[in-house]
Amino acid sequence: MTTNLKLNCDMGEGFGPWNMGDDDSIMPLIDAANIACGGHAGDPSTMRNCVELAKSHKTEIGAHVSYPDKQGFGRRAMDINGRALIDLIHYQIGALDGIARANGTRVAYVKPHGALYHVMLADVGVLNDIMTAVASWHAELELVVLATPRDRKTLQLAVEHGLTLRY
C-alpha cells in the first residue's frame, strides 16, 4: 500500500475588495488548494485569481464548499439537507469548475468547509447527501474527509457511491 501525503490549504477566502490570507505566497508551497466557492467566502474574481495561481504552480484545485454563510464565515450550522444540500453543493462546485475549465484546468476534489465539514462528520445523513452530490457530478471527484472512529461507515458509503476518499 502506498501512502501519498499532499499538503492542502484553504485559499481564495476573500471577496470583493476584502482579502484574507496571502494566497500568492502560500500557493507555491502546497500541493492542493481548497478554493472557496462563494458560500462562506469567495466570488467569481477571487476564484479566477486562485485558479490561475494554482494552475501556474501546478497545484491541484479543490472545491471548498460550505453553507451559504458569508456573515459567519461558514462556521454556523444550518438545517439544510437532502435535495437542497445536494443542489447547494452542485451550485458551488459548478461555479468553481466553470472558472477552472475556462482557464484550462479542472476541479479534482471536494472538501467541505467549517460547519458543513463538522456536521458531515457527526451526521451520516448529511455525509450521504454530500457523497451523493459529489458522486453525481459529471466528472470524477474525490471527497476529503477526516479519519475518525466511524471510518467503516464512511468507507462503506464511499464504496456505495463509487467515491474515492482523501484523508
Region annotations inferred by a language model:
Residues 149-153, 157-167:
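Active-site rim beta-loop-alpha module in soluble metabolic enzymes
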Residues 123-129:
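Charged helix-capping and loop-helix junction motifs
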Residues 35-40, 119-120, 138-149:
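Catalytic beta/alpha-barrel core
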Residues 59-78, 113:
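Short, charge-patterned binding micro-sites
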Residues 24-28, 49-62, 101-104, 135:
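Acidic (Asp/Glu)-rich catalytic clusters
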Residues 15-48:
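A short alpha/beta connector and helix-capping loop motif
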Residues 70-104, 109:
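Glycine/small-residue-rich loop that forms an oxyanion/phosphate-binding "nest" at active or ligand-binding sites
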Residues 5-9, 33-35, 61-65, 108-112, ...:
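Hydrophobic faces of well-ordered beta-strands that scaffold small-molecule active sites
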